[in-house]
Amino acid sequence: MKILHICSEMYPLIKTGGLADVMGALPYAQQQSGNDVRVLIPLYPQVAEKIGETNEVATIGTFAGLVTIRFTYFNGLGVYVIDAPHLFQRSGNPYHDSGYADYPDNYKRFALLGYLGAQLSEGLDQWWGKADILHAHDWQGGLACAYLKSWNSPVKSVFTIHNIAYPGRFHSYHLHELGLPWHFFQAEGLEFYGEISYLKAGLYFADKITTVSPTYALEITEEIAGGGMHGLLQTRKAQGRLHGVLNGVDDTVWNPETDTNIVATYKPSYMQGKSKNKAELQQMFHLPEDKDAMLMVMVTRLTEQKGADFILDRIDELMEERVQLVVLGSGSPHLEYLLNEARSRHPEQIGIYIGYNEALSHQIIAGGDVILVPSRFEPCGLTQLYGLKYGTLPLVRRTGGLADTVVDSNKESIEQRTATGFVFNYPSSDDFLEAFRRAVNLWKKNKLWSSVRQNALAQDFGWARAAASYQAIYQEIV
């Protein structure tokens, strides 16, 4: 089957979040299953630095000016890039400037991504021909599905929601400029509160919709989590067109037995390396080398969505226990300030790195005892999966993919050897604190802790399973 993925980022070429991790792994897993898979992304400066030499496929005039599509194989996978310096040759973040203001021409930049994705799926690259499946991701790829529909294309489309909180909304007057028919601007189309939504374009016009966990697929059909799209998603669910497919872990990148970003590798049958990683992490963040302190870690965006405020609200109570906390992340200036204030009060227990560092994230997860993922909502979540893989027990809220991947450590689950972490139900600092205290109590029971950790290490969230689920969805429509 010929599959073309349309996305705005792909690890290791460029990454701002979990979408990149998915796109750096899923296409490879699908290729290993015998599919002919290619990916289309913009040629950002970061991509140009890493991708190497490319060959011109086509240069065409578009609503966004003259652009060139180029092609190369990257780590064995076919990758198309959009060479349009006037749109994508910008340093830093692919979506906004250094002041966090969205680029004013984002409507055009990502409409072009969708347009060229649709063109490629229709056979613009004569050497590859037509795709069987166009698979678009998040709002940045959503218009690809609308373009295919406007051309009455036989190519089937799948649209994946990685986070429904980002609808990709723009002024309706752009519709004509982008070459889409005006009759698409209605409730049964891509109109959304008087504007156009690229996310809704994907939801409305795709043949199938997927999202990144079964629980999130249910949650987004409800008003509280549906981002205003819940009515449409209820309809798509009733039609059998909405599916939840859990993300996986890329074993070539996240594997404590082979990870080159950590000071000592380890495996379930030989865990001494994890202790060495903990000691290294404590040294890196100038914390006392205390093997008996429960070392909590957090690799996250510092936002309310991620629940960082639950931790900060009760930070002084947490620090009354024999615990340490290491945080890697950035985001809300207010939350960054509160975190720094907490460190100034507890310098022997808290370490902070404001920003993002991929290699450091591996060392932090390998060195931690508990990874905190207390999100208000979480479509799938990847850091809890990395925690399981590295024997760093996740403490999570019961939402989205967190609910699908972590089993709470209660008396019954511990006895049945199914417990893999700690789960709290309600988005509040009180509920978080209760789960934290349960984690501390288990930490003090060394044999039980080791048993739960072995359960966590035994979990299999590889990409082969997810690729098989997508294959079954594709087969329903081709």
Swiss-Prot record:
Pathway terms, separated by semicolons: Glycan biosynthesis; glycogen biosynthesis
GO BP terms, alphabetized: glycogen biosynthetic process
Source domain of life: Bacteria
GO MF terms, alphabetically ordered: alpha-1,4-glucan glucosyltransferase (ADP-glucose donor) activity; alpha-1,4-glucan glucosyltransferase (UDP-glucose donor) activity
Keyword match Isomerase: no
Family annotation (Pfam families): Glyco_transf_5, Glycos_transf_1
Summary of the function given for this chain in its UniProt record: Synthesizes alpha-1,4-glucan chains using ADP-glucose.
Name of the protein in question: Glycogen synthase
Organism whose genome encodes this protein: Actinobacillus pleuropneumoniae serotype 5b (strain L20)
Lineage start: Bacteria, Pseudomonadati, Pseudomonadota, Gammaproteobacteria, Pasteurellales
